[in-house]
Amino acid sequence: WFYTANRFWTPEHGGTHIDAPIHFFKDRERLDELPLERLIAPGAVIDVSAKCEGNADYQVTVDDLTAWESEHGQQLNDVIVLLRTGFGKHWPDRVKYMGTNERGEAAVAKLHFPGLHPDAARWLVTNRKIKVIGLDTPSIDYGQSKDFKTHVTLYEQNIPAMENVANLDQLPEKGFTVIALPMKIKGGSGGPVRVVAVMDQ
């Protein structure tokens, strides 16, 4: 007979993961409290890759979101929003993906990657009812953020965010269902998440 067993260790916020709202806002949902119906929903890909190509500090705007709505004739309600910056293609080159190969506090000032503008986050929580938001960069706030307003704005309203989401370049802008199932860590502020897309027939 044959037997294999391994041990693994991981931070809550490494690799492809989901932030529970408690990560940046007190008394909000923890990882094990996220309802399943929020984690399985139609997907909407907002493609800003052309804008990010020459601007690693690009922040997704309200206009980017409303342009998707105008093109597809529907509002961003009851969907999982996925921001395609194109930065996923740079992984695992840390310099291209994050702006620096350094780690820890010394790296913070050198981080450069796109994110969601706080004004766009505020517009979403005020005017739309999205389930989850995700993107193909290390953080929902852009790399040069010092106050993490996008995190705070979303998480205050119990809207989780997925970071380091892979293969967004393989998805259409609509016409699929996202299934995002995180490791169910009791009391977790986040954790690894397996994200799959099922194409509509």
Question: Could you tell me what each predicted segment is?
Answer:
Residues 1-201:
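Active-/binding-site microenvironments in catalytic and ligand-binding cores
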